[in-house]
């Protein structure tokens, strides 16, 4: 039986990108094109960037808590819209048969058997169709590992496989807003994605949360107020990628995590002391330790690629040792 969806379809494909990738058949850019931002959209994005205030401490010797790449996303102007006579899958309770949804200012305002819509609202008849909330995909490499994919330097930008610990990189600097996968995802009902670095490294760098909207810059897609994440990976991926230089074993992986967090603890204490007293010169900035220190402060959320139950337990032990929390395990095939 085929279901017809208006806003979103059910189903999320969450992928993993490690140091090696399998080649998959992909349409050529001529077959699938991301919608080019219109001149009005480009002007709006440029104006938003120009009007955005600089991060706290911008221009200072060091601004370890600033966001130098702040969101410039602005919602599109929209007309009040009501969808009637539709089966609503709320994801929070039973389905609503022959229900209605009111959208105002680009957001869901009312859901139920009936809604109070403005007289001038656009009315869409959803008879015979299903309606769901937009899907939030918390594990994506879209934009960073763009399609059509390759094994070279053109579109594969999610693994900075030059060191087992690359907390200094931010995946948003690899996101290509014209990736043809973006409109495909939106057509499938995915409205928000967390783009993660790949799983080649013990610590792969910062993630970013994006709205799936046309934009010429990644800042124009960034979800306002969403926290950064930190991608970590355990098990076979890092030890396979770094087998010739280390870590080449799981015990080497664990030693690598602990060494990184020990450095981050020291860095955090140095900066906390200077922020309290402002005496003397501030500590030298280190982008990688800066990210890890923000994890220890609770400002950046850890997302951990891990397969085996015993390794998940080990990662939880490490989190307890250094006082941070793991927000989610990804690919946790033994999480049950």
What do these predicted regions represent?
Residues 2-9:
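Sec-dependent signal peptide recognition
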Residues 21-67:
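Post-signal peptide N-terminal segment of mature Sec-exported envelope proteins
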Residues 334-336:
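Active-site-adjacent beta->alpha loops and helix N-cap segments on the catalytic face
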Residues 17-19:
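Bacterial signal peptide processing site
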């Amino acid at each position: 039986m085929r279901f017809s969806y208006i806003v979103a379809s059910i189903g999320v494909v969450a992928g993993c990108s490690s140091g090696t990738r399998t080649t998959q058949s992909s349409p050529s850019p001529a077959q699938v094109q991301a919608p080019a931002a219109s001149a009005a959209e480009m002007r709006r994005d440029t104006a938003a960037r120009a009007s955005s205030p600089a991060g706290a401490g911008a221009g200072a010797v060091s601004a370890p808590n600033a966001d130098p790449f702040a969101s410039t996303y602005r919602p599109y102007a929209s007309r009040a819209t009501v969808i009637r006579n539709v089966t609503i899958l709320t994801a929070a309770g039973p389905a609503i048969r022959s229900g209605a949804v009111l959208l105002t200012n680009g957001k869901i305002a009312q859901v139920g058997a009936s809604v109070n819509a403005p007289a001038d609202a656009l009315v869409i008849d959803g008879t015979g169709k299903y309606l769901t909330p937009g899907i939030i995909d918390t594990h994506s490499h879209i934009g960073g590992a763009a399609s059509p994919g390759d094994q070279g330097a053109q579109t594969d930008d999610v693994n900075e496989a030059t060191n087992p610990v690359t907390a200094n990189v931010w995946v948003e600097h690899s996101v290509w807003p014209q990736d043809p996968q973006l409109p495909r995802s939106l057509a499938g009902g995915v409205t928000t994605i967390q783009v993660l670095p790949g799983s080649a490294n013990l610590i792969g760098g910062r993630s970013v949360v994006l709205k799936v909207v046309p934009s010429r810059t990644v800042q124009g897609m960034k979800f306002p107020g969403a926290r950064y994440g930190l991608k970590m990976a355990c098990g076979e991926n890092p030890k396979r990628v770094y087998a010739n230089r280390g870590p080449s074993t799981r015990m080497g992986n664990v030693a690598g995590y602990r060494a990184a967090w020990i450095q981050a603890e020291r860095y955090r204490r140095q900066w906390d002391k200077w922020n309290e007293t402002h005496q003397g010169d501030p500590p030298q900035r280190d982008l990688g330790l800066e990210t890890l220190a923000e994890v220890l402060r609770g400002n950046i959320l850890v997302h951990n690629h891990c397969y085996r139950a015993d390794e998940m337990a080990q990662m939880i032990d490490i989190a307890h040792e250094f006082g941070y929390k793991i927000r989610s395990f990804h690919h946790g095939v033994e999480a049950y």
